[in-house]
Amino acid sequence: MSSTAENQRVNFASIKNQFPYPDFLEVQLKSFQDFLQLDTPPEKRKKEGLYKVFAENFPIADTRNNFVLEFLDYYIDPPRYCIDECIARGLTYSVPLKAKLKLYCTDPDHEDFDTVIQDVYLGPIPYMTDRGTFVINGAERVVVSQLHRSPGVFFGQSTHANGTKLYSARIIPFKGSWIEFATDINNVMYAYIDRKKKLPVTTLLRAIGFESDRDILEIFNLAEEVKVTKANLKKFIGRKLAARVLKTWVEDFVDEDTGEVVSIERNDVIIDRESVLDSDNIEAILDSGTQNILLHREDQNLSDYAIIYNTLQKDPSNSEKEAVLYIYRQLRNAEPADEASAREVITNLFFSEKRYDLGEVGRYRINKKLGLTTSADVKVLTKEDIIEIIKYLIELINSKAIVDDIDHLSNRRVRTVGEQLYNQFGIGLARMSRTVRERMNVRDNEVFTPIDLINAKTISSVVNSFFGTNALSQFMDQTNPLAEITHKRRLSALGPGGLSRERAGFEVRDVHYTHYGRLCPIETPEGPNIGLISSLCVYAKINDLGFISTPYRKVADGKVDFSEEGLQYYTAEEEEELTIAQGNAPLDDNGKFIRDKVKARFEADFPVVPPSEIDLMDVAPQQIASIAASLIPFLEHDDANRALMGSNMMRQAVPLLRTDAPIVGTGIEAQVARDSRTQIMAEREGEVVFVDATCIKIKYDRTEDEEFVSFEDAVKTYNIPKWRKTNQSTTVDLKPTCHRGQRVKAGDILTEGYSTQKGELALGRNVKVAYMPWKGYNYEDAIVLNERMVREDFFTSVHVDEYILEVRETKRGMEELTSDIPNVSEEATKDLDERGIVRVGARIEPGDILIGKITPKGESDPSPEEKLLRAIFGDKAGDVKDASLKATPSLRGVVIETALFSKAVKKRKSRLTDKAILPKLDEEYEEKMASLKTLLVDKLLVLTNGKVSQGVKDYMNTEIIAKGAKFTRKSLEELDYNSIQVSKWTADAQKNELIKQVILNYLKKYKELDAELRRKKFDLTIGDELPTGIVQMAKVYIAKKRKIQVGDKMAGRHGNKGIVSKIVRQEDMPFLEDGTPVDICLNPLGVPSRMNLGQIFEAVLGWAGRELDVKFATPIFDGATLDDLNEWTDKAGIPRYGKSYLYDGGTGERFDQPATVGVTYFLKLGHMVDDKMHARSIGPYSLITQQPLGGKAQFGGQRFGEMEVWALEAFGAAHVLQEILTIKSDDVVGRSKAYEAIVKGDPMPQPGIPESLNVLLHELRGLGLSFTLD
């Protein structure tokens, strides 16, 4: 048990120096960094991600190979808008992608064509924020990693209806055709290409070069060759033939079209396979002119290879040519033009690098499975692969090998963001290269450049459709920091190329032993997606091949290696055959196991073994669970089903106005808060120089060299988000926790708020709870709350809604924002400003106008009255209608922010003033650029002082400053630093590094200034960037402060959820002997059947913590024991197990039995009654059936369904039933008559015919059946 200074938690973990958690967002951030490789110099980039896409698609040449477009390098420019601006304006946070391309001519006829190197704009790439998200059209989205079947070879088994076992081998590539080898009930092996046509496997073998029966049998060493002589053959009478005896002859015929004589080779079967050699056959063999025959080997176990003989019997082909033509006919259902084209089709299927790609993973898996040593660079199938797969299948049939477990994590891999983007860019660039080729072919003799060839929209349209419509690009769950971090670490088996809910069976959803330490067995959704969507465990990482690995410590001779080398990450495959000890197995100070028998894990078994047999040891007991499950204290005492609900409900906890970290935590809370990146953190050592509610300024320490090479100010400003709306309408509101003059170091958290307190995750509040019934109000999991919770804002949260109104240009004219709305009282528009937008601070009630807008009406002939009004008041009076945005029926709140974005619709006069401003902007920019370059040259002169050039070159490898020349101000000023090579300027390596850094920093600053100028020009000439067709966009943000109320859903961390049923005055709540009233009464019957005892442990320890003002960390599976609880309750002077007598708040009498009392952490969930309460009197109707719509969003009605009708029928309430089915629903005439009758006070009319009956009659008439109603 230890106490850490950082967060002052008493830790019950048995392991003192715990292995640190990896960065929880690494799965997203690293994948995207590896995709772009921006921090890597171009010459050192690995062939992966975006670089690999370019390498695969370039160079591009025209059909005659005259012109070649070559790829040199790619880079990105700074984004036009920052993240916050993109969210506010509804834009995508993206960076411009540019490529340096080289176009040259190889044709001597075009000598005048100069080689062109150009920077070409390829469109915007959505750029990942430092929080691992993408901002797409103003909304934060997450690209979820996909768990899919790994490329490679898979061996499976199925059972035919007649009980025969059928075996199959399927080769799955990254790109290209699938091929499957399968047996049938007749013990014949077939090959299926792309799940279409089947052909005997021997036909495929012939087509790939094993032409004769002899070649095929030799692969499996099944036949012996006998020279044909009479004496020789007589020795082998009674032996079986292994191959057909063929007579080959040539047939000549005249081609009718050309008149030429054409010869065709023919094969006649003289004796079939499996025939027994006898004296009659000998004569036939001698007559055929065959040189050699094949006989079955006598020493081979022929039954093992019976399938090969059976397949040869079914094989319709006798030579390579026949096999190739047969396969072509099967695949294409047509005759091939010639043998060469048929052969090309087969080569393209599996042996062409352009058409077929196993990928690095596929090759690795095939080599591993079949024990091959083929080079990792060979990404296509080889003959050896196919033969080895057939041999393995034969072993399977003979029960000498085992089938693959498809759910084993060695057979499933993860497609991370980077890989998914690689696939999308691959599609985009392939399309682009097609258009480039076409343009090259068309522009044969013209002078053209790379820019003329490339259409930037091709790539961006593919990438945008991926982010906008792909099932794995999801709207981020942003309810609280835990929800965010979990969403980014989620793995989905669904999506394109994955499973579908309907087809996924029980096995694929189930927990597998290889999930240990990789996929959480607890955290998965309830419902149709159970088991298909899972979460990464806390220590899990995804390796370069996409397999999930988990860390273990090595153990040798019963001693655990605690050194850095002793810790290693293992994939599911590497872990096979190893015995692994649990993370909390007792060890002595030397790392040796104390006990002579150790609980261990070996694949799916849990043996108890001596220490000498242990190979590895878990790094920590919490290795098995995900972040959310690791946040549940005493998880080991909860039933798994309830733990699943607990971990899922913590993601739904709304951030509260007043945050409060849990008294009983698990020790992972600080890491979650830090790695979620929702707080502002110091980047390095420095000093806080300014703090207020909206920003923090830090002056970072810099070394002399850093100071010298930098073009930036040493002080960095961080803006603090205030009441910022999240995707789920909860709020991010941070407040600073640092002060002026404070020294900070890298990773220090400087703010709190948004479910975070003092650098720890704080999703709910610590409240005093009693497990006792209270007047029946906590029946069936309902919760009784103390009024103090409402009064003191314990569970108060703030929710912000965004309301948008767009102004468009219509056919009838321009819409307009205004507070001058026709036929609306002054009272209704009192809070609108001159632009028609409600003022900040206004209180909003249902029906209030938020944004005033008028839109032109359709022209009709005005009446005399209208003519008069127009004559008096001008043209405005009658030709516009009110199109304002009004508050919905349930909306109440306060306006906290408004925004108006407009495109620059300019009059001639303002355009003239803009013309005058633009040159000034250019001048200002030129001055800034000049002073920046002067500063650069000054720095370079200091660095190159007294040094001579080693030959400074540009991208074309032309020497600009000659080798041996001295650096002068003039030579340095004349350089174009955008096209310069920054390495090896001088002979001093240290100075070279500084020169490189100075130039790179200069270019970064140069690009920033350039982007700033473009932005200013854009704002001036075009205005705000808005979607097409929209002239203005007004936004209003309304905050709602929601106290806890009856009907809200609350939950603990152990799956103990309930609805608030009554809020009781403080004086009426049950109280303890010292007069303390409890905050919450929970039903004790909610515990035994749910088996989530963790809540009781938490309550007792929480009470001790509150009394002693101590916070605890009890890590899962390694936390506080019952003895520890008793020790702390005794210290706190409270009853053991929390058993206390309570007194009735109403009468003051003591209850008969003691109840369990404690302090538990409770959350308020996002399911609030305010969002669900709804009532309808009249509202919209469905167009076809004329029945009321459903749902709160549509202002719909309550469905009176089949069972409700039965209930009224059972009571005999005929009139009520008729009314509900007619005038309250879809009797159109009846409902207007009923309304009229109610208004006039007349008796109710007779109901008419429901519209849905008319719909049915129309449908029947559509079928040609005529009906009339009498």
Curated annotation (Swiss-Prot):
<keyword id="KW-0808">Transferase</keyword>
<dbReference type="InterPro" id="IPR042107">
    <property type="entry name" value="DNA-dir_RNA_pol_bsu_ext_1_sf"/>
</dbReference>
<dbReference type="InterPro" id="IPR007642">
    <property type="entry name" value="RNA_pol_Rpb2_2"/>
</dbReference>
<keyword id="KW-0548">Nucleotidyltransferase</keyword>
<comment type="similarity">
    <text>Belongs to the RNA polymerase beta chain family.</text>
</comment>
<dbReference type="GO" id="GO:0006508">
    <property type="term" value="P:proteolysis"/>
</dbReference>
<comment type="subunit">
    <text>The RNAP catalytic core consists of 2 alpha, 1 beta, 1 beta' and 1 omega subunit. When a sigma factor is associated with the core the holoenzyme is formed, which can initiate transcription.</text>
</comment>
<dbReference type="Pfam" id="PF04561">
    <property type="entry name" value="RNA_pol_Rpb2_2"/>
</dbReference>
<dbReference type="Pfam" id="PF00562">
    <property type="entry name" value="RNA_pol_Rpb2_6"/>
</dbReference>
<dbReference type="InterPro" id="IPR007121">
    <property type="entry name" value="RNA_pol_bsu_CS"/>
</dbReference>
<dbReference type="InterPro" id="IPR007644">
    <property type="entry name" value="RNA_pol_bsu_protrusion"/>
</dbReference>
<keyword id="KW-0240">DNA-directed RNA polymerase</keyword>
<dbReference type="Pfam" id="PF04563">
    <property type="entry name" value="RNA_pol_Rpb2_1"/>
</dbReference>
<dbReference type="GO" id="GO:0003677">
    <property type="term" value="F:DNA binding"/>
</dbReference>
<dbReference type="InterPro" id="IPR019462">
    <property type="entry name" value="DNA-dir_RNA_pol_bsu_external_1"/>
</dbReference>
<dbReference type="Pfam" id="PF04565">
    <property type="entry name" value="RNA_pol_Rpb2_3"/>
</dbReference>
<comment type="function">
    <text>DNA-dependent RNA polymerase catalyzes the transcription of DNA into RNA using the four ribonucleoside triphosphates as substrates.</text>
</comment>
<dbReference type="Pfam" id="PF10385">
    <property type="entry name" value="RNA_pol_Rpb2_45"/>
</dbReference>
<dbReference type="InterPro" id="IPR007645">
    <property type="entry name" value="RNA_pol_Rpb2_3"/>
</dbReference>
<dbReference type="InterPro" id="IPR037034">
    <property type="entry name" value="RNA_pol_Rpb2_2_sf"/>
</dbReference>
<dbReference type="GO" id="GO:0003899">
    <property type="term" value="F:DNA-directed RNA polymerase activity"/>
</dbReference>
<dbReference type="InterPro" id="IPR037033">
    <property type="entry name" value="DNA-dir_RNAP_su2_hyb_sf"/>
</dbReference>
<keyword id="KW-0804">Transcription</keyword>
<protein>
    <recommendedName>
        <fullName>DNA-directed RNA polymerase subunit beta</fullName>
        <ecNumber>2.7.7.6</ecNumber>
    </recommendedName>
</protein>
<dbReference type="GO" id="GO:0032549">
    <property type="term" value="F:ribonucleoside binding"/>
</dbReference>
<dbReference type="InterPro" id="IPR001969">
    <property type="entry name" value="Aspartic_peptidase_AS"/>
</dbReference>
<dbReference type="GO" id="GO:0000428">
    <property type="term" value="C:DNA-directed RNA polymerase complex"/>
</dbReference>
<dbReference type="InterPro" id="IPR007120">
    <property type="entry name" value="DNA-dir_RNAP_su2_dom"/>
</dbReference>
<dbReference type="GO" id="GO:0004190">
    <property type="term" value="F:aspartic-type endopeptidase activity"/>
</dbReference>
<dbReference type="InterPro" id="IPR010243">
    <property type="entry name" value="RNA_pol_bsu_bac"/>
</dbReference>
<dbReference type="InterPro" id="IPR007641">
    <property type="entry name" value="RNA_pol_Rpb2_7"/>
</dbReference>
<dbReference type="GO" id="GO:0006351">
    <property type="term" value="P:DNA-templated transcription"/>
</dbReference>
<dbReference type="InterPro" id="IPR015712">
    <property type="entry name" value="DNA-dir_RNA_pol_su2"/>
</dbReference>
<dbReference type="InterPro" id="IPR014724">
    <property type="entry name" value="RNA_pol_RPB2_OB-fold"/>
</dbReference>
<dbReference type="Pfam" id="PF04560">
    <property type="entry name" value="RNA_pol_Rpb2_7"/>
</dbReference>
